[in-house]
């Protein structure tokens, strides 16, 4: 297969949702980080991991019908979109873990935490040799920020959070929900609030035309 054809196959799903125009956003300025952020991130050698260009933060064209201020997650393409006005969105590359596949539909951010602690579920402990509790810090797999999703006033156990493994951005791995680089999750965290609507696309839904049912459901949550 020609190189151009291969690239089309690899990134086709993201282009459908994200459009052809894209503009890379410059790295966050120091002003975006709190003194605590700077101290903890300075102790994290993994922050120097190289992120492939398609998974760096971009502003892209956006064809779906969700309202500005909505988060849309396309696990298939490994992208999270923060919808902007005028048919644009900020597109973030993500890592997708098995827990991210347990929920699809419309939810809201029910709570938000800076530098969260982590208590692994019993299911995760069956698969992995992990401690019962990990405190906040650069070695915590939840990273610098966490947003907890609720539907019908119940915790979905679905999270959007940072990572201590940025080298896996753009990939699927064995555990976790939706992981962004710590720089990106700090950026997203500043843009959202408790009550922000999150649309989680079902598998294979992200590369289809806009889904009126999901888009209208997101509108009803406003």
Q: Each predicted region: which residue ranges?
A:
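N-terminal pre-domains immediately preceding structured catalytic cores
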Residues: 2-4, 8-178, 182-222
